[in-house]
Amino acid sequence: MEAYYSVLAKKGFFPLQEVKDQFSKFGSPYIGHPNNKLPGIEMNSGSLGHGLPVCVGMALAGKRDGRDYRVYTVMGDGELAEGSIWEAAMAAHQYHLDNLCAVIDRNHLQISGNTEDVMGHENLHDRFASFGWHVIDVSDGNDIDALQKAFIEAKNTKNQPTVIIANTLKGKGSPVMENKASWHHHVPSKEEYATIMADLKKREEAI
């Protein structure tokens, strides 16, 4: 959420310093999930399985109103255990929503541990393809260039919705966080923060 709020702040919806000072504090509007009381945010989310169904509705409304906007949603792989995701996937195919693109953050981790131990998600490509979706596999979902190519392909896909399966590494960039489920909602200590920022600085300098 910090990244989402930061992007909106950079776009002028609210002051960036306000986000830095108030994020996730008691009584703050900058809570841990999107808050539609803030400008630039149309819907609250957080409860698993809500994002894709709402986006299907937005995409369908756009089609019926003759508007040319596109709808994007990001889902965690753990979220795919929710039945509402698959109901929405069927509806997106039924209405040929080629203005809809879903991105799955496939890092094999959720708040309660490994996704495969909770609810297996093998053959995601074939599952979505069987629901009538155009499926794009990105082997390195942390590669921005690869993701950009996938978004271009999605935009050029006609008559069916697109899902991008982005195989990612949770917490990539710092060994302190990488591939650890405990960082799903962990707030770093001052020492951890300093180490993480130093790791990210090294990566930035290496680019």
For each feature predicted by the language model, list its residue ranges.
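Glycine/aspartate-rich loop-and-adjacent alpha/beta segment that forms the canonical ThDP
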Residues: I144, Q148-I207
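Conserved thiamine diphosphate
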Residues: G66-Y69, E116-A150, K201-I207
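Short acidic, glycine/serine/threonine-rich loops at helix termini
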Residues: Y5-S6, S84-W86, S112-E116, S174-N179
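A short alpha/beta connector and helix-capping loop motif
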Residues: E82-N107, V163-I165
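Cofactor-binding active-site loop characterized by glycine-rich and histidine/acidic residues
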Residues: M1-Q94
